[in-house]
Amino acid sequence: MVFRRILPLIALLFGVAACTLPSNAPQTAASAAAAGQGAGQTGAPVLPREIEREVGPPYADAALQAYVDGVGQKLLAQAGMGGSYRFAVLDLPIANAHAMSNYVFVTRGLLASLDDEAELAAALGHELGHLGQHHAAQRARARQGVLDAAVEAAVVTGSPTVGRSVARDGLLALRRYSREQELEADRLGLSLLVRAGYRGDAMASLIEKLRRQSQFELQLMGEAPDSVDRRSATSTHPAPVERLTALEGIPEAQAPGATNRPAYLAAINGMSVDDAPEEGFVRDNKFLHPLLKIGFTAPRDFRLFNDQDGVLGVGRDHSLLFFSCTKEPMPGSLAEWMRNKLKPTPTDIQSAEIDDSEAAIGARPRGSDTGLGQVRYVMVRHGDQVCYFNLLSEGPDRDRRIEVLVAAARTFRTLSDAEAAALHPYRLRVITPNGASAAQLAQRLPYGDFKMERLLVLNGVDNAAELARLPQVKTIEP
């Protein structure tokens, strides 16, 4: 289970068309807001700096951290692994878990998706399976071997093309091997959770919940939900149905055991399910930052993804928007800076005014990359920062669509003190329905769309009838 950061995705999607700022220490919106803050928050474990830089900050809830570590230590006692290990919750809204060094991490986004302690044990056990079998080291050695072979092939044949071919084929084989590692980690994690006294079907129900969440994410993007069960030859993970099928033949998968659902729900009750305030909040198709006091509104069909590096917006027609801010000094006009510093140099550069502030708008030079559609760059001065949008539209409707994206960039504005003060993270609450129907519970959610679908996915059920059978229900409150 590996989560991806936004910047590599931006480089892949935008390529040379991205509005690339000079590399002399730019500061993102999130890092600007968080500048000067200490490494550890109250209640959060202090991680080694190099590990926190890689995985993200820990969540500031001492009781929840202790609870998760306690479940992990219970599994570790069954694993027979030497050394000491820590289990920690990361302050990230995405659903994920992974292991690094002597740490096993779960995100609060994953905790929100799970239904009981047994499923948490399944997630932690899966990652202990990776650690116990030294999968990370195996992959690193295998990857280096592939790269060495590629270099040797290029030298012997005198052909860089041959070297690239060897590297490509070898890395694909390595990815296939990675799928075997995932299935092995499922088996080992299953054995651990059963020996620790948890229900054996928790591994399957964990995978099924992650599958449902992935299907819902695809639905939000207008994609086919069943595509989550299809994988290509280049996939780094087995498809969920492949993992579920592999578990069916293992007797332990049906072993009885504890769920500890009440204790689990009590531990996550009140947990944030939102972005951290220093990174701003996504509210439907709006981005609002309470510390920088800025915001903008994307087109209605856009899905926004927030990250410490910036905000990525993806439209149903695969149009793209990327937003961030920098404290890099930009003397003179923004139009002049854009003309002299951005490469390739934009065309049709216009000075503009957005939110009563200086702005500049430019276009990608025609012919600079025929593989891309319409690209626009929008820069706005905001106090001692410059905020910028990279906009991309492809397809037959790209000319009209790019103007829609520019109009979205023009919604950039400064939030009032009252607006900023009113912004708080959404939180998970565990409630007793007390006769409230699924429709009534769904209507209370603070989202503008897919209310029922969100409620069902959050509780890991397929329909309202299944939800009605739950004695306690998870919901989201502002």
Regions found by a protein language model. Name each.
Residues G15-A18:
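C-terminal motif of bacterial Sec signal peptides marking the signal peptidase cleavage site
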Residues T20-T157, L171-L174, S191-I207, R212-V228, ...:
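Peri-catalytic and regulatory segments of divalent metal-dependent proteins
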Residues A121, Q254, F389-R429:
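Surface-exposed amphipathic alpha-helical segments
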Residues V273-N306:
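N-terminal "mature-domain start" segment
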Residues G295-L342:
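Secretory pathway targeting signatures of secreted, lumenal, and periplasmic proteins
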Residues F322, R339-Y388, L392:
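Signature of long, low-cysteine stretches enriched in small and polar/charged residues
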Residues E419-D449:
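Primarily a LysM-type cell-wall glycan-binding module
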Residues K451-P478:
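Extracellular LysM carbohydrate-binding repeats and other cell-envelope/extracellular binding modules
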